[in-house]
């Protein structure tokens, strides 16, 4: 799913276990089990929650699946976390309008950073 949706590729070793160690996750599957959309939440369970790996198969985009994944993840944070959680994500250009429509705002003057490996 990561590759076909345009996310950075990961190795099998990197893929072994992220769902089990995520605070929450959501998938949308077809009747045949085909993975059409996904997303997950990383967090400490108290205050900080980071939404990551939100992706939709291009063959299933523009059908509301990404929105459904995001709404489910946000609902779970709001429902299960203590009040006033700090929710972040890194919004790639294709998803920014969706994220903004869900209430996300730019975090300026903060800027997301990464450590290349």
Model-found features: residue ranges?
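Short amphipathic alpha-helix that is part of the acyltransferase structural core
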Residues: 1-13, 110
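A short helix-loop-beta-strand connector motif used in the catalytic cores of GNAT acetyltransferases and
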Residues: 16-27, 31, 83-85
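Conserved beta-strand in the GNAT
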Residues: 27, 34-43, 47-50, 55
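Residue-level recognition of the GNAT/N-acetyltransferase active site
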Residues: 57, 61, 92
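Conserved acetyl-CoA pyrophosphate-binding loop and the N-cap/start of the following alpha-helix
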Residues: 60, 64-72
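Conserved GNAT acetyl-CoA-binding A-motif
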Residues: 70, 77-91
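Short glycine/proline-centered loop/turn elements that form peptide/ligand docking sites
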Residues: 70, 93-94, 116-117
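Conserved catalytic-core motifs of GNAT/GCN5-like acyltransferases
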Residues: 84, 88-90, 100, 105-117
């Amino acid at each position: 799913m990561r590759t076909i949706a345009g996310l950075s590729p990961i190795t099998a070793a990197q893929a072994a276990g992220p769902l089990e160690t995520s605070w929450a996750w959501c998938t949308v599957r077809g009747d045949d089990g085909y993975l059409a959309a996904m997303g997950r939440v990383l967090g400490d369970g108290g205050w900080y929650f980071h939404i990551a790996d939100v992706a939709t198969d291009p063959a299933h985009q523009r059908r509301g699946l990404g929105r459904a994944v995001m709404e489910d993840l946000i609902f779970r944070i709001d429902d299960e976390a203590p009040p006033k959680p700090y929710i972040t994500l890194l919004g790639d250009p294709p998803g920014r309008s969706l994220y903004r429509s869900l209430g996300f705002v730019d975090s300026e003057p903060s800027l997301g950073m990464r450590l290349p490996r």
